Design a protein with these regions (language model features):
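Conserved catalytic network of the ASCE P-loop NTPase/AAA+ motor domain
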Residues: 12, 62, 76, 126, ...
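C-terminal-of-GTPase-core extension/linker across diverse P-loop GTPases
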Residues: 3-8, 12, 142-264, 281-283, ...
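A glycine-rich (often HGG/GG-containing) alpha/beta subdomain
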Residues: 1-146, 150, 154, 331
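Switch I (G2) and immediately adjacent beta-strands of P-loop GTPase domains
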Residues: 53-64, 69-73, 253-281, 299
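Short alpha-helix of the ABC ATPase nucleotide-binding domain corresponding to the H-loop/switch region
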Residues: 278, 286-290, 318
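Generic enzyme active-site microenvironment
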Residues: 272, 306, 333
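Glycine-rich, N-terminal phosphate-binding loop of Rossmann-like dinucleotide-binding domains
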Residues: 22, 88-90, 240, 275, ...
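Inter-motif core of Ras-like GTPase G domains
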Residues: 286-310
């Protein structure tokens, strides 16, 4: 990792400010070949993290831009290496010329995620923090950003490390008793082992219990829109999206497949799924769409059951209602409140009933309130919510192995058998933070990053 890398950290689109990011042994001195301080002093004379004005030159020595730069010396930098940033005006041409000048000065193009990979390999962060960097970049709500920021600061690592370290101590003591039976080593009672391992299993269970809310905070609440044809499902999707995402006509069966759109509803990130109207049909394509509608209700966080409030309920409405009631949560939406009503809300078996008019855009504040009640902000988004499927899978494997170790203890199995389970648990838990590192896992993680991060 001693080679010098460089990248445009802000992308190649026109922006107000563009940043060239550099890292590696000797990068500060090499950067001084293309960026010269107005003071005439070398770039390496700057104190850490102090912006200074200067001029960026291209590979032929021609001035490109008047800009700012700062340096950070190892190990007190993002990557743990000597680093520098040159902040220019965001001209793609100027940034490209500056990058080519850096290549001529001995830098190479950074690979996607290479700055953060170096931070991980140099011990500046663990894998949970590295993955949280991506989550922070992708965050679409304040809650998602706050939770990711907490994980960048090490919230998950602070929960995992004490458990892992406790298992290391148990393994070491177990090995000592097994390997040196004649030594005067304080024996660790079986009940002591069992209590310790059971406590750590409970801690992992508590961490896993945050997965559902963590997924909804980071990726969105999956809300499937169900109803009979022409109830206003697609109109609801369009109104919440703020634009015409799907075609709306008076012809039943216009929507024949699921259509997804992510929207923000108050503090909630919601992944809306519009579905085909549920009815009996001889049209082969529409029938496939209806079947998908029924299946979608089983794979969501909440069903939004849309009814045309201006007409009495039909058998098609009741069939759609049955599908909605199979969802984990459901909200009945009485659409077309701009017309005289024909449905009595008290006849509907729903805890949440929201009257709206997609035509007049009324009642959507009530829909937001229903989401607030169904998905309360009852857990702090401080980084403690588990949002990452890879991490959750590894924690679940660790829990299964430690539970197996407890069962082995209770069954009177030999210490060697217990150790097999415990060391398997350690391997799995170590994958969460990267203490037990697999190259295929780290490659997959850092491939998700953009160039310059």
């Amino acid at each position: 990792m001693s080679d010098k890398i460089a990248a445009i950290a802000t992308g190649r689109a026109r922006t107000g400010i563009g940043i060239l990011r550099l890292s590696g042994d000797g990068c500060i001195e090499a950067a001084g070949q293309v960026f010269r301080l107005n003071s005439g002093r070398p770039l390496s004379s700057l104190p850490d993290r102090k912006l200074a004005l200067g001029t960026l030159f291209d590979a032929q020595g021609r001035p490109i831009d008047h800009c700012m730069a700062f340096i950070s010396r190892a190990p007190h930098s993002y990557t743990g290496e000597d680093t520098a940033e040159i902040q220019c005006h965001g001209s793609p041409a100027a940034l490209t010329a500056g990058l080519e000048a850096l290549f001529a000065a001995g830098f190479r193009q950074a690979r996607p995620g290479e700055f953060t990979r170096r931070a991980f390999l140099n011990g500046q962060m663990d894998l949970t923090q590295a993955e949280a960097v991506i989550d922070l970049i992708d965050a679409e709500t304040a809650d998602a950003a706050a939770n990711a920021a907490g994980q960048v600061a090490g919230a998950i690592r602070k929960k995992i490390d004490p458990i892992y370290d406790g298992w290391v101590d148990l393994c070491a003591h177990f090995h000592a008793v097994l390997d040196y039976p004649d030594e005067d080593i304080d024996p660790f009672t079986l009940s002591g082992y069992e209590a310790s391992l059971t406590a750590s299993s409970r801690q992992l269970t508590a961490l896993l219990s945050s997965c559902r809310r963590g997924r909804m905070v980071q990726s969105g609440i999956k809300a499937v829109i169900l109803g009979s044809p022409n109830a206003g499902k697609s109109s609801l999707l369009n109104r919440l999206s703020g634009f015409d995402r799907v075609i709306v006509t008076d012809i039943p069966g216009t929507t024949r497949d699921t259509v997804e759109q992510t929207v923000t509803l108050g503090r909630h990130l919601v992944r809306l799924v519009d579905t085909a109207g549920i009815r009996d049909t001889q049209d082969v394509i529409e029938k496939i769409g209806v079947d998908r509608s029924m299946e979608a209700a089983k794979d969501c966080d909440v069903a939004l059951y849309v009814l045309d409030n201006s007409k009495p309920m039909t058998e098609e409405d009741r069939r759609a209602m049955g599908a909605a009631l199979e969802a984990p949560e459901a909200i009945a939406i009485l659409n077309k409140q701009d017309l005289p009503g024909a449905i009595e809300p008290s006849d509907l078996p729903f805890s949440y009933i929201v009257p709206i008019s997609c035509k007049d855009s009324t009642g959507f504040d009530l829909l937001e309130q229903a989401f607030d009640m169904l998905f309360p902000d009852d857990a702090p988004c401080d980084g403690s919510l588990l949002t990452n499927a890879r991490q959750a899978g590894a924690i679940l494997r660790a829990k299964k192995s430690v539970d197996s170790a407890v069962q082995s203890l209770r069954a009177g199995m030999t210490p060697d058998a217990v150790l097999v389970d415990l060391e398997s648990a350690m391997d799995a838990l170590g994958e969460v933070t990267g203490r037990t590192m697999r190259e295929d896992i780290t490659n997959r993680i850092f491939e998700r990053f953009c160039v310059g991060k």
